[in-house]
């Protein structure tokens, strides 16, 4: 059935809420590139040089990991091959896996994301694709599918290469996708991991490299839920992180963070600055609730008792809003030719809310059954019978005339 655009009513609600509006200038962010996004909608809340080409270092590992999670089996055991270890330059982080060591996919993911063990990514790549090069092709294909515009990877782990680059915006896009996977979320939120004894090594214990989730760190945020650190001398300090507070989940990416003169870590200071800004200026607001009455109609051909019909929301509608200035509009699309009979919960249209540059739509449902008007139905039958009678008489007259 075609839909007819019907603007029933537009409501504009402007609420000015008391409270401080925390803001900052680009120079308050020490990192060369940064971005803050809402994880639910992907909306950008702050950015600084977010589309500039940057070296990602170990933040690369989130893409490697999500592909391994999606294509592998966490309980599978795989064997560490010599090539996976040999290509890791000295000085890069490692779990010192041994050639011939048998280890599960889940254990590899944990030591890869939590301890940043570079060889683990190569082991995962060979497990999934048979070779590191083939797996890297998958990485670039996945990045393209996710909408990344300026990303090109040449390895699984972020070991420096001039042709291995991305942007803060692309990493935020990848991180947002990764955080939709429950296994990924669980691993990156772990404060530590333990690799059980294997055929080549005793039990090993590793702490998460992300100080935002370390309770003993001066940068600890109780509402931080991951994700991944990174560092090379060329990339400088990097961090992708995620926080969830009061139902609002934000993702921050900072790249090229310098070492500050006071020995404080710019990647954590910048990330905390971004989260303070985000949670002081934005919130997730319930615009409307499932079952709310938003419109009322008289149904054509409905009987007197049921023809007056409320249209109710089919789902809750939540939106990211600026807490200091909420501007909400809505419009309604109703189906053509709404008439009885109608069953309760039938879909009769759509309501679309607009908040800033974001839109949210949900169905409009019938609140109750609407029955057809019996009198109208009877009249219709009588008229049909009369028409049939008239046609019969005409046919008889024509037939007699021919005789």
Q: What are the roles of these predicted feature ranges?
A:
Residues 23-182, 186-187:
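Active-site-adjacent loops and short helices of periplasmic peptidoglycan-processing enzymes
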Residues 2-26, 380-399:
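Sec-dependent N-terminal signal peptides of Gram-positive bacterial secreted proteins and lipoproteins
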Residues 15, 67-68, 242:
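Hydrophobic/aromatic ligand-binding patch that stacks against planar heteroaromatic rings
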Residues 1-3, 47, 372, 402-403:
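Short, Lys/Arg-rich N-terminal segment immediately upstream of the first membrane anchor
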Residues 148-149, 163-165, 170, 175-402:
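Domain-terminus/edge residues, biased toward the C-terminal soluble/receptor-binding domains
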Residues 1-2, 58, 278, 396:
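Short alpha-helical segments used as structural interaction elements across diverse proteins
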Residues 16-17, 73, 274, 282:
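Hydrophobic alpha-helical membrane context
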């Amino acid at each position: 059935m075609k839909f007819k655009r019907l603007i029933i009513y537009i409501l504009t609600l402007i609420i000015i809420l008391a409270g401080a509006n925390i803001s900052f200038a680009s120079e308050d962010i020490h990192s060369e590139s940064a971005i803050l996004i809402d994880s639910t909608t992907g909306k950008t809340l702050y950015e600084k040089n977010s589309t500039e080409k940057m070296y990602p270092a170990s933040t690369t590992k989130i893409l490697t990991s999500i592909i391994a999670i999606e294509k592998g089996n966490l309980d599978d055991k795989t064997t560490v091959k010599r090539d996976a270890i040999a290509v890791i330059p000295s000085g890069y982080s490692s779990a010192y896996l041994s050639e011939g060591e048998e280890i599960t996919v889940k254990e590899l993911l944990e030591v890869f994301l939590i301890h940043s063990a570079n060889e683990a990514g190569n082991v995962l790549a060979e497990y999934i694709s048979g070779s590191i090069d083939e797996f890297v092709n998958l990485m670039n294909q996945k990045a393209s599918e996710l909408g990344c515009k300026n990303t090109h990877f040449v390895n699984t782990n972020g070991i420096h290469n001039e042709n291995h680059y991305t942007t803060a915006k692309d990493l935020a896009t990848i991180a947002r996708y990764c955080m939709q996977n429950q296994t990924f979320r669980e691993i990156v939120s772990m404060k530590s991991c333990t690799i059980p004894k294997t055929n080549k090594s005793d039990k090993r214990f590793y702490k998460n490299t992300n100080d935002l989730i370390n309770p003993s760190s001066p940068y600890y945020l109780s509402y931080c839920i991951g994700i991944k650190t990174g560092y090379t001398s060329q990339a400088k300090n990097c961090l992708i992180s995620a926080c969830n507070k009061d139902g609002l989940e934000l993702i921050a990416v900072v790249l090229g963070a310098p070492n500050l003169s006071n020995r404080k870590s710019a990647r954590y200071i910048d990330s905390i600055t971004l989260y303070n800004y985000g949670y002081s200026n934005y919130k997730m607001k319930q615009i409307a609730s499932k079952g709310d009455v938003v419109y009322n109609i008289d149904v054509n051909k409905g009987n007197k008792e049921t023809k007056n019909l409320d249209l109710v929301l089919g789902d809750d509608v939540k939106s990211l809003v600026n807490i200091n200035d909420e501007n909400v509009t809505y419009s309604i699309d109703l189906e053509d030719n709404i008439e009885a009979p109608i069953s309760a919960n039938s879909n009769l249209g759509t309501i679309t809310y607009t908040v800033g540059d974001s839109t949210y739509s949900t169905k409009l449902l019938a609140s109750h059954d609407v029955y057809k008007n019996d009198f109208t139905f009877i009249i219709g039958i009588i008229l049909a019978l009369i028409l049939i009678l008239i046609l019969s008489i005409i046919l008889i007259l024509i037939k007699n005339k021919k005789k």
